[in-house]
Design a protein with these regions (language model features):
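Compositionally biased, low-complexity flexible segments
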Residues: 627-634, 643
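Low-complexity, intrinsically disordered segments with a bias for serine/threonine
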Residues: 642-648
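Structural and coupling elements of P-loop NTPases
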Residues: 1-609
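Short, intrinsically disordered C-terminal tails of secreted or membrane-associated proteins
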Residues: 650-657
Length: 658
């Protein structure tokens, strides 16, 4: 079998914030992609605005560098568990991975997840211990922890012999030993060439390409990205689209342009052959998971199974009093088109129709996954509202199962007690607790996914912002029972108008506020949170009554406390089942699902009435069975019994519901 020794295809995988994008920056700079006098931003691969703001990678990205005559195609992947679907699908394009591990934190939940996916595809692994220049770094211990993780995941002997490289991506240096002098990334380049296998040379076989990523360009439309598994592709070639999930489906299409990756650019080429990662244009309806084939062999390539969503929320048309004021796209048709268009690029997302034409059920991998979608739509000009996130349950053997998360917490020892207590109340189970290192202690919990909803903000408060919490989906387990709801309740406006200093001053006596003076509010809008756990209705638009009478002294100036500005994730954690978040291009507001206070009052009383009625009928049935059993056992209701009259009265009472 022949191999293309001029190509290597690799993916950089790791837990969030372990330095993947910074490592790619260093590889790009030292491969000669940039001019010597060229100013290059940090984390140059994170080109998306939200990625730069949040400091995380959301979308996987392709680049390529040249070293010693070999082209190295590199895929930078997300590290956050919510975007694990991006990692799963791009692993089909590569022949090996570089696993990045923080020299202080060691293997984290997402490290285990991405490593497991790599093992399932039998990909060779290079382990890079990054951030060795951190003062608290412990690289030798981290190496042992990585090997323990390999054994836990059932790695073969060949995988256990994986090479280890030590690096400081920020400084742009690497070495094969800790005590050697490190001056560049050359040791990592050499390890990639020596250890990652070259793709198979199969350019003379039938053409096949699996689409793993979709991009979009206003000029050329949809762009399919994937690795050519076999054969050769030329411009204007006619190929067939088939899909392993659609038996019998095929469509003949024509390739317009072919691009290969060079640095941060895409270079147009006339043809490309097996082993190359390419981007193609000209196919209007191309999707992730499609296989492009020649006419001779139309057998589709298997696409990797993507993990199922664990969380859902309803996206619906905005029906608040302020609806349509600033939004560009506000109708249910526009909302539907945008959500279903997202399915073409996000394989982890699910969108379902509901009983209402104005509402859609959207399921994802976590709060961050869905909040990034919301933020993207908001910036595009969409106006809509979303409900409280709900966990997706499963029924297995007629029993209710729920998703379980593995949570890893690094925190100062003084906060450990409070965290164990809080997560215990949320049905969390402490699995491991490591000895303190550098003043920090690591805790590992297994906890229902619904137990984490609303906890992250509470965690940051309890640890005074000094704790680190990471979670990743573990498995489904039997339902753990009820979990206590939030302690704080909503402060709700019962009128519409402009918030005044006088009204806000009175309202802030009840709790912290979300709105400031001069902001427009409407009836049913949540304007703050009360620490007492009881929902409160206030008027924040109330003005001080003016009279002709003047006090002997001047009025004191009113002092308002700072407004509590919630992030979108914090708002999603805060809201209850009867609340929504109104999303607009300019801002978002928390509101009640039923805006009218009178309608909410009637709805609550109606629920109480049905509850009381259910209790009455249950008690009536119970009493009927109990009395009949007692009277029949002792034959109290014989014709001569003194209780015959009582039985008649009892039956009449029960039968008439009195």
């Amino acid at each position: 079998m022949n191999y293309r020794e001029d190509i290597r295809n690799i993916a950089i995988i790791a837990h969030v914030d372990h330095g993947k994008t910074t490592l790619v920056d260093a590889l790009l700079k030292q491969s000669g992609i940039f001019r010597k006098n060229q100013v290059v931003n940090e984390r140059v691969m994170d080109s998306n605005a939200i990625e730069r703001e949040r400091g995380i990678t959301i979308l996987s990205k392709n680049t390529a560098v040249h070293y010693n005559g070999v082209k190295i195609n590199i895929i930078d992947t997300p590290g956050h568990a919510d975007f694990g679907g991006e990692v799963e699908r791009v692993l089909k394009m590569v022949n090996g991975v570089v696993l990045l591990v923080d020299a202080f934190e060691g293997p984290m939940p997402q490290t285990k997840f991405v490593l497991k996916k790599s093992f399932e595809l039998n990909l060779p692994v290079i382990v890079c211990i990054n951030k060795i220049d951190r003062p608290e770094a412990r690289p030798e211990e981290v190496v042992d922890e990585v090997l323990d993780l390999f054994i836990e995941l059932g790695a073969s002997e060949d995988v256990l012999d994986a090479p280890f490289v030590y690096a400081s991506a920020k400084r742009g240096v690497a070495g094969k030993k800790l005590d050697e002098e490190m001056t560049s990334m050359e040791p990592l380049f050499q390890t990639i060439l020596n250890y990652i296998p070259a793709p198979v040379e199969a350019s003379n076989e039938s053409f096949k390409l699996l689409i793993s990523t979709i991009d979009y360009n206003d000029y050329v439309g949809r762009i399919g990205i994937g690795k050519i598994e076999s054969g050769t592709l030329k411009e204007n070639d006619s190929v067939y689209i088939v899909n392993s999930t659609k038996p019998g489906y095929e469509e003949k299409v024509k390739i317009s342009k072919i691009y290969e990756f060079e640095g941060l650019e895409r270079d147009e080429v006339e043809s490309s052959s097996s082993g190359s990662i390419v981007a193609i244009t000209g196919i209007e309806d191309i999707n992730i998971g499609d296989t492009l084939t020649s006419e001779q062999d139309k057998e589709p390539l298997e696409f990797v199974k993507i993990s199922e969503p664990t969380l859902s929320m309803n996206f619906s048309v905005n029906d608040s009093p302020f609806a349509g004021k600033v939004g560009k796209f506000v109708t249910s048709r526009q909302l539907r088109q945008r959500l279903f268009r997202e399915l073409q690029t996000d394989v982890s997302l699910r969108v379902e129709e509901t009983n209402s034409t104005d509402s859609f059920k959207v399921s994802g991998r976590g709060e961050l996954h869905l909040s990034v979608l919301i933020e993207n739509m908001r910036r595009e000009g969409y106006e809509f509202q979303v409900s409280k996130p709900q966990v997706l349950f499963k029924t297995i053997d007629s029993k209710k199962y729920e998703p379980i998360e593995r949570v890893t917490i690094d925190v100062s020892s003084e906060y450990v007690g409070a965290i164990i207590e809080k997560l215990g109340r949320r049905k969390g189970e402490l699995v491991t607790m490591q000895e303190p290192q550098g003043g920090y202690q690591r805790l590992e919990f297994l906890i229902p996914a619904r137990g984490l909803i609303g906890y992250r903000t509470e965690f940051m408060t309890d640890t005074k912002g000094n704790g680190i919490l990471n979670s990743v989906f573990e498995d489904y387990a039997p339902y753990k029972g009820d979990i206590p709801r939030r302690v704080n309740a909503s402060i709700v406006s019962f009128d519409t108008g402009v918030a005044s200093t006088y009204g806000l001053n009175n309202a802030q006596q009840r709790g912290s506020l979300f709105v400031g003076p001069g902001e427009e509010v409407y009836e049913g809008q949540v304007v703050g949170e009360s620490p007492k756990g009881v929902e409160i209705e206030v008027s924040v638009t109330k003005e001080k009554k003016q009279t002709n009478v003047r006090a002997s002294g001047s009025d004191e100036a009113l002092k308002l406390l700072p407004v509590k500005n919630l992030t979108l994730e914090e708002a999603l954690e805060f809201i209850e089942d009867d609340e929504l978040i109104e999303i607009t291009p300019e801002d978002f507001r928390i509101r009640k699902e039923i805006l009218s206070s009178q309608q909410r009052y009637k709805s609550k009383n109606k629920k109480k009435w049905f509850y009381a009625k259910d209790i009455f009928w249950c008690n009536k049935i119970f009493c009927t069975i109990l009395f009949n059993n007692i009277f029949n056992k002792y034959n109290f209701f014989s014709s001569s019994s003194v209780f015959s009259k009582e039985k008649t009265y009892f039956n009449l009472a029960v039968g008439n519901g009195n």
